[in-house]
Amino acid sequence: MKFTKTEARKRRHFRVRHKVVGTAERPRLNVFKSNTNFYAQIIDDTKGVTLVSASTLKMDLKSKSNIQAAEKVAEELTKKALAANINQVVFDRNGYLYHGKIKAFAQKARENGLKF
């Protein structure tokens, strides 16, 4: 039985979520990409609370779903995270391959000061 791209991503994410857990000391950095926007949030899984979030929904960009948009979201998210005294996170790529937008997002977040 062949899986679609979305089903395969969800299966990968399900497997990874058993291993990746965000705590108060090291919350989980989760990313999601749709056809039109890019979203990222930092989550404390022990409390079930989103600590910081950023997305392209409110940004004024020419294209909200390309690599440059993902880098802008990374800049905004790291700025908010460092202001909230969050330095270390666990990266949850949500089943996506570490390539393209996800890779650009992660590299920009590391450049701006997040450790993962």
UniProtKB/Swiss-Prot annotation:
Pfam families with a match to the protein in the record: Ribosomal_L18p
The keyword RNA-binding is assigned to this record: yes
Keywords: Ribonucleoprotein, Ribosomal protein, RNA-binding, rRNA-binding
Cystine bridges: none
Highest rank taxon of the organism: Bacteria
CDD domains membership: Ribosomal_L18_L5e
SUPFAM superfamilies: Translational machinery components (SSF53137)
UniProt xrefs under InterPro entries: Ribosomal_uL18_bac-type, Ribosomal_uL18_bac/euk
GO MF annotation terms: 5S rRNA binding; structural constituent of ribosome
GO cellular component terms listed in the entry, alphabetical order: cytosolic large ribosomal subunit
GO biological process: one example: translation
Protein family according to the UniProt entry: Belongs to the universal ribosomal protein uL18 family.
Self-association state and partner proteins as the record states: Part of the 50S ribosomal subunit; part of the 5S rRNA/L5/L18/L25 subcomplex. Contacts the 5S and 23S rRNAs.
Function: This is one of the proteins that bind and probably mediate the attachment of the 5S RNA into the large ribosomal subunit, where it forms part of the central protuberance.
Protein name, as recorded: Large ribosomal subunit protein uL18
Organism placement in taxonomy: Bacteria, Bacillati, Mycoplasmatota, Mollicutes, Mycoplasmataceae
